[in-house]
Amino acid sequence: MKMQKGNVLLMFGLLLHLEAATNSNETSTSANTGSSVISSGASTATNSGSSVTSSGVSTATISGSSVTSNGVSIVTNSEFHTTSSGISTATNSEFSTVSSGISIATNSESSTTSSGASTATNSESSTPSSGASTATNSDSSTTSSGASTATNSDSSTTSSEASTATNSESSTTSSGASTATNSESSTVSSRASTATNSESSTTSSGASTATNSESRTTSNGAGTATNSESSTTSSGASTATNSESSTPSSGAGTATNSESSTTSSGAGTATNSESSTVSSGISTVTNSESSTPSSGANTATNSESSTTSSGANTATNSDSSTTSSGASTATNSESSTTSSGASTATNSESSTTSSGASTATNSGSSTTSSGTSTATNSESSTVSSGASTATTSESSTTSSGASTATNSESSTVSSGASTATNSESSTTSSGANTATNSGSSVTSAGSGTAALTGMHTTSHSASTAVSEAKPGGSLVPWEIFLITLVSVVAAVGLFAGLFFCVRNSLSLRNTFNTAVYHPHGLNHGLGPGPGGNHGAPHRPRWSPNWFWRRPVSSIAMEMSGRNSGP
């Protein structure tokens, strides 16, 4: 039996039907339980399918889903972990989301923080909004305001444009249409979403159709889930078949052999789904583990996670695809996110574009915000309000400026131009930045040039750092190569010039001698004359021309001998 996924916010509807599993202002401890719900108290759930805590402390270990609101939550090896207005710590969890609080995710697949601090270590995706984020060895992704096209990228996210993700691990689109195929997670906001064979599909403010997806949730619309792990519908009718749990609230619901299906004031149909949630929208989920649409149209087929909010999303076999108020197309993508922009991600793990154009090919992460981005074979590329070109770079971020990153691990530019080549980390804010093979370069309101630097920071000034964190006097490999190349070219040019100069000068001298000393006959050597040899054979003297195999003619030598005689 699969662990539940997707019962994040609307699982509180279970309080109306599962009073036996509910504690108010008390402490609850559940082991190997299908569902555990606590309101205003402490909860400890171990190996449970779902654990929900409101205004209290929750600790979930190896649980399918753990949700905490206005409290502290600690989740270990959990599939889903969400915390609102509190502190969250997730270890080895697939999803960790924190809103208005602090989140620490270690080895988690996805970690999202809104209006708070986030620390992600070895996490597949970490996205902070309006807060501080520290990500180490994270796969990640995030972009705003532009069009994105990601191909074979690790993560693709697009905001305020259309997004198309193919074979990407996660695809997310906001304010546009999204189409995700074979992606791990697909999320669409404020448009229609179609997810096929995706791990998770979520749609807000629209219709959703999910097939063979692990988790599907729809808000403000009708939902139909088939063979999905979790199906939840709010504000509509729900029909769940072969699902583990089905709970409808203020609507019609039909659940058959379903693990979990919740419907609240909406229409939902779930068949063989583990978790499917629909809230005030239309959702159709088939064989999906988790799919959530909210106020939009979403179609997810065999998708693990697909989310659509007020936009169109089509996810097929995608792990994660998210679209919000934009168009997104994700195919076999692990993560692709588009928000109010156009995004095309193909086989990309993470690609993010917001209100700009982005093209990512085989990139781990590509993010574009209000600008144009082109990422090829890059793990992470982020552009915000500027143009970015990333090639085989792990992370490249540009905000309101132009960025060109090549084979760089991390490059970030904000309101300036950035060129990063083979650099581990390069960050520029309101200035120009050029980082080459640098470990870390940060520039704020100024221009910075970093080459192979361990750490370079500039604030409101111009800075140039070369080979920081390296022994004094050491040169960058490309500098050594350039110097050597220039030296070789100069030496070859010098020798070639000398050769031709000497050769031309000797050739002109020989021609001059032949023209001046004109021959006077064939028998000139036998006639009398001053300095003559009177018929004796004349041995020509040594001449520099012999060095060039241009011997002086005998006539010229004889004339020279006559002139030199008494």
Swiss-Prot record:
UniProt PTM comment: O-glycosylated.
Classification via InterPro entries: Mucin_dom, Tandem-repeating_mucin
Extent of the signal sequence: 1-24
Keyword Transmembrane helix included in the entry's annotation: yes
Residues on Extracellular side: 25-479
Protein topology in the membrane: Single-pass type I membrane protein
Source taxon at top rank: Eukaryota
Any one GO BP annotation for this protein: negative regulation of cell-cell adhesion
UniProt Sequence repeat ranges: 31-44, 45-59, 60-74, 75-89, 90-104, 105-119, 120-134, 135-149, 150-164, 165-179, 180-194, 195-209, 210-224, 225-239, 244-254, 255-269, 270-284, 285-299, 300-314, 315-329, 330-344, 345-359, 360-374, 375-389, 390-404, 405-419, 420-434, 435-449
Miscellaneous comment text of the record: Could be considered as a marker for lung carcinomas.
Name the record gives this protein: Mucin-21
Naturally occurring in which organism (per UniProt): Homo sapiens
